């Protein structure tokens, strides 16, 4: 029996999101699903968090209030990277596995979540062999999607210039070992921008070795790209 469900989409354009270390959309589907089922996360016995990448699992734990070392475990299939996602259909398999495990544990409750795109589309369902005791009706997601859509979006500048700091970053390597650095940063007026770093080994090695979040520097346009130089 499906006791609760919820679905939302986060801000579609990644550069317009509030930050890169939280997911208000996951938090909202958890809030809605647990309210619909009249329970909280401590009442479920089985959990399967969508597990395309470690960061998706970490965000799920953070937003749903589940410890990363929760003794209940975070997957019932072994996780998407190991179980697989045949036909781009992993969540159907996690729901079927959940049904099998709940039939073996009558009366227990289980939570399955899913996400798609760049941790953009989110869903949650709470299941049990126990029948729903009251009238049940799915809430139209449009009624609460507005909570996400109305969140403040950072201003994104295409031509940043001047003092800036790192909001998040990555060093990307191709199959031949060629590397380049990518910065998402904030200018002095808090506008967000995208920029490359210089491609010298000293800079890229430093980015791989040290924590660069919050580091300051200068950003400017150089030809067709924005370039960020660490102070």
Short names for language-model regions:
Residues 1-24, 28, 32, 96-97, ...:
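Condensing-enzyme catalytic core mediating Claisen C-C bond formation in acyl metabolism
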Residues 190-208:
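Beta-strand/loop nucleic-acid-binding surfaces
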Residues 30-43:
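Phosphate/pyrophosphate-binding loops at sites that engage ATP/ADP/AMP, CoA/4′-phosphopantetheine
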Residues 3-12, 20-25, 63-94:
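Conserved catalytic cysteine-centered active-site region
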Residues 36-39, 53, 86-106:
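Active-site-proximal alpha-helical scaffold in enzymes
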């Amino acid at each position: 029996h499906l006791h609760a469900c919820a679905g939302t989409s986060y801000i579609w354009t990644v550069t317009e999101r509030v930050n890169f270390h939280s997911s208000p959309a996951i938090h909202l589907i958890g809030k809605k699903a647990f309210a619909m089922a009249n329970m909280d996360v401590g009442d479920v016995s089985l959990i399967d968090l969508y597990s395309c990448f470690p960061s998706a699992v970490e965000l799920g734990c953070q937003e749903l209030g589940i410890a990363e070392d929760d003794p209940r475990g975070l997957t019932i299939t072994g996780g998407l990277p190991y179980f697989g996602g045949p036909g781009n259909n992993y969540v159907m398999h996690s729901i079927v596995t959940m049904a099998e495990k709940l039939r073996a544990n009558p009366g227990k409750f289980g939570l399955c979540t899913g996400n798609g795109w760049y941790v953009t589309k989110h869903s949650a369902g709470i299941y049990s062999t126990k029948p729903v005791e009251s009238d049940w009706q799915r809430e139209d997601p449009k009624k609460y999607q507005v909570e996400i859509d109305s969140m403040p979006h950072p201003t994104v500048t295409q031509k940043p210039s001047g003092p800036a700091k790192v909001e998040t970053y990555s060093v990307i390597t191709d199959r031949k070992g060629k590397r380049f650095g990518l910065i998402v940063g904030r200018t002095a007026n808090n506008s967000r921008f995208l920029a490359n770093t210089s491609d010298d080994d000293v800079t890229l090695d430093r980015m791989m070795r040290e924590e660069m979040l919050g580091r300051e520097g200068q950003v400017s346009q150089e030809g067709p790209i924005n370039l960020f130089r660490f102070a």
